[in-house]
Amino acid sequence: MYPTSIFQSAELSIDDKNKLNMVINHLLFLMRIKSVSLYEHSQRVSNLAAATAIYMRLTANEITLIRNAGLLHDIGLICVPNHVLTNYPYVSKRDIQVYKRHPDLGANILESCPGMEDLIPLIRFHHERWDGTGYPKHLKKILSLIHI
């Protein structure tokens, strides 16, 4: 039986790792074109998340998943207009709603990338909060690796 996600496989082939890294690098390239500060933010989040995962003694696959989630957590912002991205939160209520769609937009981007299935919920729900005040779904009592 084949894993549904490349993150589920304990032994990834070099070809699979190369494909994953190529897709991630292409997405990061698009992010950097959109905004250097957004790209740099994602690098910092990824480094901090990976360091935390290592400290927690998670498995190599979990560390890779968390590192990649940190890199791509805001990939949906490439779909948000520049004036909203650069002025948030000092924008209209309508533009705030556009901005708050970025987790879903990012998850939708990853849905078209084979092997990224494990990343999708981490991207989609990274702004959810325990008390339901997060977005985009206002979920309550959700706790994931992203919040640990």
Model-derived regions: residue spans:
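Histidine- and acidic-residue-rich, metal-dependent catalytic cores
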Residues: 1-147
